[in-house]
Swiss-Prot record:
Catalyzed reaction equations: Zn(2+)(in) = Zn(2+)(out)
Lineage, highest ranks first: Eukaryota, Metazoa, Chordata, Craniata, Vertebrata
Transmembrane regions listed in the UniProt entry: 211-231, 243-263, 286-306, 440-460, 466-486, 504-524
Ranges in the topological domain labelled Extracellular: 20-210, 264-285, 461-465, 525-535
Cytoplasmic side: 232-242, 307-439, 487-503
Residues with the Pros-methylhistidine modification: 371
Name listed for the protein in its UniProt record: Zinc transporter ZIP5
Length: 535
């Protein structure tokens, strides 16, 4: 590969500048040779037969990052970020005062034979003489009365607009001398950064839109509470366990997917605003993490099934020898009869007391919580934790909807998939503590109100005078990963008793479905944004 295009263009512009002020320089040979070198490099890369066609100019502008704005700018005539561009009045004054000085500069530029490869141009008379053909082009370029509406020198110009501004034909090939005239404009476009996308500040209407969408999301997330109570009443323990296993795996997939594919990329400043290639590059690392998590989850569960099947005949044989109940689900009765004389009455009474004093199994998803201390203090701790949990969920939703609709949608789905098994476990434990269904519904309404407060706080932190969206996203991603990998995933990997193959496959399906759902939303993020009115 040849030298970078930016270096070639910089060297060419330096050569042209030296040529312009060459009236006071006695020897212009090195400057012309350097200029010819860079011209030859550029025309060798993008030109044809010593000229630069419209297609070659378009490829050059694309390589320089010019010719097309890559996103919304701060305003149609506002300066780019980090640079004080001149105002419209300054531009107009500059153009009114420029011709006399510019003619003196152009007068020093050597337009005689310079080795540029154009025989007709090499025969052009010197500007110090009376050659009207040479002065005609320069005076049209310098003295042309460009209006503010026609000469958009503060906008990102494509190839056709550049040529029209310079009085050149958009379809005719460019000679090296004509291309040298465009060099300062290209350098100015690069320096002013008018073709670089800068994020637009959030207008006041976006605050109302973010508040509305986050409030609706919090109301939608209050549905898991009555759904949990309904499932606890309708489903028995035998059906509740596989359903909770599937929902728990779905929650792990959605929480990890939202953290890795949405929250962390947005917290680091990456946005899926470009083509699909840029989107795939942003999603690649997070998707690979999800793939590794899914593979190891299925591998560990498969090894557990194999180990359990290898140990089951020996365990069953030992239990039959001891006369204990056989918990093998494939056994129809689940019990093994033994003679009455094999055990004395005190032993039978002790086994009966142990069975009565053993605590009841908590629903899956809450195996990590300690339920040894009975009483009202446990219920209040659970309620306090649920209120704080809803407050942080509302905070995450407010920040997500402040960033965009697709980001808020993915966070809403992730929180919903996590809330259903979480509420099932909490309500099952509170029912064991003696709380009624009516009190549980009332407490769920109180925690939902805290979620609304958290959503308003998240919008205020994200769209306030000092935007804290990256910090909120980073904190939310950490919370989601902790809940998924520390609180929920160990419950799926360490069940209280070995799971059948169907349950393991159901959990794998839930994990895969949750990650795929977040990945689909990330891919369709650009298509989801226009579906929301601007407020």
């Amino acid at each position: 590969m040849g030298p970078p295009v930016h270096h070639l263009l910089t060297g060419l512009c330096v050569g042209v500048a030296l040529g312009w002020v060459g009236g006071s320089v006695p020897n212009l040979g090195p400057a012309e040779q350097e200029q010819n070198h860079y011209l030859a490099q550029l025309f060798g890369l993008y030109g044809e037969n010593g000229t630069l066609t419209a297609g070659g100019l378009a490829r050059l502008l694309h390589s320089l990052g010019l010719g097309r704005v890559q996103g919304l700018r701060l305003g149609h005539h506002e300066p780019p970020t980090g640079r004080a561009a001149p105002t419209s009045g300054d531009n107009f004054t500059h153009r009114l005062q420029e011709p006399e000085l510019s003619v003196d500069i152009w007068a020093g530029m050597p337009l005689g034979p310079s080795g540029w490869g154009d025989q007709e141009e090499s025969k052009a008379p010197d500007l110090h003489g009376s050659g009207p053909s040479s002065l005609d082009l320069f005076q049209r370029l310098l003295l042309l009365d460009h209006s503010l509406a026609d000469h958009l020198n503060e906008d990102c110009l494509n190839g056709s607009q550049l040529l029209v501004n310079f009085g050149l034909s958009p379809v005719a090939p460019l000679t090296p001398r004509q291309f040298a005239l465009l060099c300062p404009a290209l350098l100015y476009q690069i320096d002013s950064r008018v073709c670089i996308k800068t994020p637009a500040p959030a207008p006041p209407g976006d605050v109302l839109s973010a508040l509305l969408h986050s409030g609706l999301a919090v109301l939608f997330l209050s549905l898991p509470a009555p759904l949990s109570l309904l499932l606890l009443r309708l489903l028995g323990p035998r059906l509740l366990r596989p359903v909770l296993g599937f929902l728990g795996a779905l929650a792990v997939g959605t929480l990890c997917g939202d953290a890795l594919l949405h929250l962390l990329p947005h917290a680091q400043g990456g946005r899926h605003t470009g083509p699909s290639e840029q989107s795939e590059e942003d999603l690649g690392p997070g998707l690979s993490v999800l793939g590794g998590l899914f593979l190891l989850f299925m591998l560990e569960n498969t090894l557990g099934l194999v180990r359990h099947r290898g140990l089951r005949p020996r365990c069953c044989r030992n239990k039959r020898d001891l006369g204990e109940p056989n918990p093998d689900p494939e056994d129809g009765s689940g019990m093994v009869l033994r003679p009455l004389q094999a055990a004395s009455e005190p032993e039978v009474q002790g086994q009966r007391e142990n069975r009565q004093s053993s605590p009841s199994l908590a629903p899956p998803g809450h195996q990590g919580h300690s339920h040894e201390h009975r009483g009202g203090s446990i219920a209040w701790m659970v309620l306090l934790g649920d209120c704080l949990h809803n407050l942080t969920d509302g905070l995450a939703l407010g920040a997500a909807f402040s960033d965009g609709f697709s980001s808020g949608l993915s966070t809403t789905l992730a929180v919903f998939c996590h809330e259903l098994p979480h509420e099932l476990g909490d309500f099952a434990m509170l029912l064991q503590e003696g709380l009624s269904f009516r009190k549980l519904l009332l407490l769920s309404l109180v925690s939902g109100a805290l979620g609304l407060g958290g959503a308003a706080l998240g919008v205020g932190l994200s769209l306030g005078p000092v935007p804290l969206t990256p910090w909120v996203f980073g904190t939310t991603a950490g919370v989601f990963l902790y809940v998924a990998l520390v609180d929920m995933l160990p419950t799926l990997l360490r069940p209280p008793e070995p799971l059948p193959v169907f349950h393991v496959l159901l959990q794998g399906l839930g994990l895969l479905l949750g990650g795929s759902l977040m990945f689909t939303i990330a891919l369709l993020e650009e298509q989801l944004v226009p579906t929301v009115p601007d407020g």
